[in-house]
Amino acid sequence: MEKYHGLEKIGEGTYGVVYKAQNNYGETFALKKIRLEKEDEGIPSTAIREISILKELKHSNIVKLYDVIHTKKRLILVFEHLDQDLKKLLDVCDGGLESVTAKSFLLQLLSGIAYCHEHRVLHRDLKPQNLLINREGELKIADFGLARAFGIPVRKYTHEVVTLWYRAPDILMGSKKYSTPIDMWSVGCIFAEMVNGRPLFPGVSETDQLMRIFRILGTPNSENWPNVTELPKYDPDFMVYEPLPWETFLKGLDDTGIDLLSKMLRLDPNQRITAKQALEHAYFKESN
């Protein structure tokens, strides 16, 4: 820690406190001080292993992890620092982003996700707060792999409930076999939010979250989602909803954009488009 000075607390994330600091050369970094659940046991070896994988991820759309400092009691991750995140931008952009901006951010998000999925790393906690942006319009994904290294928490460090808004229905219904499709669901939710300017499924509990999803996309059954009835939290008494036409809840997205989003937000994870496939979609071939 001696290398870094001028510590300024800039946030409390899901896993601990984030500081802005400078090194002796005047370069700015984001220091993420990880709170360990059981401090007496030290850092779990699984976390160390995951973090070492993160150091190997090198992509222009992923926040770079420069250094890992660990003592017996704490773990500090040294990341590149960016000034703003997508949530803050959406908060001030009433009615959503311009279509060219939304498309650029989505393309960058998918590029970073595709790279990580190719390297067998899941994010598991994608949301606008984890997407950092700079003045040049570059988007970088933060907190990659931390959900796996430290477990997806139920509450934030500040005792806020972790948002469920971007969580896939298979996870909400207790699936333990999750893979890359859970990230693609989150990407779809973020895409819709960039276009609409507000969250698509702002649930207040796991049950409410599922019902909000079903009210828009329809209630799943064995025909459109094989084996859904075997999920631990599937309820045969779920209210039955028919899917709504996409145009009714998406403003300002053309047909190719709707087609791409519909492939991201498939209820059945096995039917969801992959990041690599999404990058090849016609939506990115057309000019605005």
Swiss-Prot record:
Which EC number applies? 2.7.11.22, 2.7.11.23
Question: What Pfam families is this protein classified in?
Answer: Pkinase
Query: Is-annotated flag, keyword Chaperone?
Result: no
GO cellular component annotations of the record = cytoplasm; nucleus
Which of the residues bear the PTM Phosphothreonine?
T14, T158
Activity regulation, per record: Phosphorylation at Thr-14 or Tyr-15 inactivates the enzyme, while phosphorylation at Thr-158 activates it.
Q: What name does the UniProt record give this protein?
A: Cyclin-dependent kinase 2 homolog
What's the source species' lineage?
A: Eukaryota, Sar, Alveolata, Apicomplexa, Aconoidasida
